[in-house]
């Protein structure tokens, strides 16, 4: 069984999957992945449709985070040392976060895996932009 781990970061999913005998291909920009590239630049069609049985994606949550609202009224280098406005945050989400999410969905659509997971904090805004069917799963609902 093959797993594609997008935005692999600490490889927490991939490590466990490998221990269980799964073949894992990881993608991230951190230099520790099997494929080190910006997901927006990845030519995923080098793999055939259906190649991966499972896709696990943990897209960056920072552009969708409600915590960013605490930046309003502050000067931040990320925004060019100008005072941050709500409009700037919304524009950043649409210009940075949403394209990454759309590419993730495009990849999932292409591979059409048996299972796919898109992990992101429940309090963030990513769920407002997801176009694929999804279930909201929270480990707290299971007693953890």
Regions found by a protein language model. Name each.
Residues 6-7, 35-36, 40-55, 61-144:
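Class I S-adenosyl-L-methionine
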């Amino acid at each position: 069984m093959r797993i594609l781990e997008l935005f692999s970061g600490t490889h927490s999913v991939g490590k466990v999957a490998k221990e269980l005998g799964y073949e894992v291909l990881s993608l991230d920009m951190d230099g520790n992945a099997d494929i080190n590239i910006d997901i927006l630049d990845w030519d995923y069609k080098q793999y055939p449709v259906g190649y991966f049985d499972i896709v696990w994606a943990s897209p960056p949550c920072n552009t969708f985070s409600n915590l960013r609202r605490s930046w309003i009224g502050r000067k931040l280098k990320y925004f060019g040392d100008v005072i941050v406005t709500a409009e700037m945050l919304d524009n950043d989400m649409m210009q940075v976060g949403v394209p990454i999410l759309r590419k993730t969905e495009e990849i999932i659509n292409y591979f059409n895996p048996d299972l796919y997971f898109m992990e992101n904090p429940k309090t963030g805004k990513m769920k407002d932009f997801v176009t694929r069917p999804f279930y909201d799963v929270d480990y707290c609902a299971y007693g953890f």
